[in-house]
């Protein structure tokens, strides 16, 4: 009985242990499954976190590149503003010099006018006041051409001064346009990589578009100071077509090429690691070097009819791409010069084109100044001839006045004058139709009688004029 109870107790105890172990195992399995599920979720979150960290690293790299380009653009903007201040200073000095010349011309014109008026007044003061209307009209016909030339000279000086004032106003407007263009170019530099993923033809068109904007902002006129896509046949009878030919004063030309490809720079800009970025950088430098050699072999300077300078401007349409290549390989400038090529970016090309535009403006001003000088020289010659003619007229008038006085003396002055003798005929009973001017005739007779009385000894006048009451009154 006791053994049976013990066995039953042992069996029950064993069964309970088995049941407990089974329950514990089931609970452990449940916990293990929960842990596995939780670990899987943690792995998913870890993978997402790693991807987010990779994206953040990429954006930090992109942000650093953009910050570098922004600092570069700020530096370029500072340099450009310094160049603008220098150009503005030179232009103001030139304008001041031109204004001084204009003031000198105006003063010279005023002095000539005053001298002419003084001369005319002196001549008119010595002229006979009884000159008839026909003589005055003759003088006016002589003075009118000179007056018209003086008025034309005054208008030309005023127009030149007004043009200078308008150019000063235009300069301030162009400076504002240049600042807006600089901001626009900076924005385009940030978005440019989206436009550089096409083929070489598309990139060449993009470069030509940027070049066209720079030319438009420079103030040069298409068809006058520059031409685009001009087709020229070389000595080998093959056609060459430079992108732009800029005309310079003194009959010179300069060629601009805008076909530089920037595919490697686009890969450099979008590279995600240093190795890829370095490889793209070397490819970009090699692309610039290859285009220098290709452009040098074209030998634009030898094209017939092209009065080109000894170098060609190789235009890189993206400012950061230009600065990156020269920063890593400064010797590219020397290599380009050996091939008669100058590397230019939008900023440096704009400064060069603005300088050319100013050269054209100074050329036009110089031609106008020469024209004014020629007109002034001709006016001076006309003035000299006019003064000589007026002097001759004055001498002729003086001589005519002397002849007039001599004739009037013979007519109505002195002893035996003509009018006195004519009046004597009238006293003898000669019939007349109309009397001579009574005042002049009386003066002539009176002077004739005075001369006669002076020639008669005193006390014997009555013997010669016994019945002449007028003579007696004169004697009394």
From Swiss-Prot:
Superkingdom to which the source organism belongs: Bacteria
Database matches in Pfam families: RmuC (PF02646)
UniProt region (Disordered), positions on chain: 447-476
InterPro entries linked: DNA_recombination_RmuC
Biased composition (Basic and acidic residues): 449-476
Keyword Coiled coil attached: yes
GO biological process: DNA recombination
Coiled-coil spans in chain: 25-202
Keywords, ordered alphabetically: Coiled coil, DNA recombination
PANTHER family in UniProt: DNA RECOMBINATION PROTEIN RMUC
UniProt record similarity statement: Belongs to the RmuC family.
Function: Involved in DNA recombination.
Name the UniProt record assigns to this protein: DNA recombination protein RmuC
Species whose genome carries this gene: Salmonella typhimurium (strain LT2 / SGSC1412 / ATCC 700720)
